[in-house]
């Protein structure tokens, strides 16, 4: 399981360090794709396969299903870490997530998310205020 928040930098070649605590669970190869809220989603292969199976079952006759799967899969790229524990993030993905220099890497259960520092701080500030309300609306168990 992925959890925690880490701050890292993207270098001029588009490489960034993946936190050591995430490396083993990500495995030798993993998938990076466009996520929701202008961040990147990073999945270990086993989780990616589960997600792929679920998304294949969406009705392709529905316009929204086609749009979502196109968006999600067209941005996906298989990646691996170099010897220094860095991943090279493709330019279109960096542009999508507005990754320039500083970024935030967070663990979210079965995936990792990569955010620009600015977008993460903005998202967190907005979400922090409504966290209790969000939890009340979606969570059906005691925290």
Swiss-Prot record:
Pfam family, one: MraZ
Keyword DNA-binding in annotation: yes
CDD domains listed in its UniProt record: MraZ_C, MraZ_N
Compartments it resides in: Cytoplasm, Nucleoid
One annotated GO biological process: negative regulation of DNA-templated transcription initiation
Boundaries of every SpoVT-AbrB domain copy: 5-47, 76-119
InterPro entries xrefs: MraZ (IPR003444), MraZ_C (IPR035644), MraZ_dom (IPR020603), MraZ_N (IPR035642), MraZ_sf (IPR038619), SpoVT-AbrB_dom (IPR007159), SpoVT-AbrB_sf (IPR037914)
Any one annotated GO CC term: nucleoid
SUPFAM superfamilies noted in UniProt: AbrB/MazE/MraZ-like
Organism superkingdom: Bacteria
Keywords, in A-Z order: Cytoplasm, DNA-binding, Repeat, Transcription, Transcription regulation
Molecular function via GO: DNA-binding transcription factor activity; transcription cis-regulatory region binding
Protein family (similarity comment): Belongs to the MraZ family.
Subunit note: Forms oligomers.
Protein name (database record): Transcriptional regulator MraZ
């Amino acid at each position: 399981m992925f959890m925690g928040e880490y701050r890292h930098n993207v270098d001029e070649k588009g490489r960034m360090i993946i936190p050591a605590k995430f490396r083993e669970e990500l495995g030798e190869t993993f998938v990076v794709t466009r996520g929701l809220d202008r961040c990147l989603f990073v999945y270990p292969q086993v989780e990616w396969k589960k997600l792929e199976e679920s998304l294949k079952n969406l009705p392709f006759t529905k316009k929204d299903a086609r749009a979502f799967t196109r968006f999600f899969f067209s941005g996906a790229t298989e990646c691996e870490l170099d010897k220094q524990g860095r991943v090279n993030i493709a330019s279109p993905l960096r542009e999508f997530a507005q990754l320039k220099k500083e970024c935030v890497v967070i663990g979210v259960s079965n995936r990792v998310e990569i955010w620009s520092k600015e977008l993460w701080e903005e998202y967190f500030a907005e979400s922090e205020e409504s966290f209790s309300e969000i939890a009340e609306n979606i969570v059906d168990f005691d925290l």
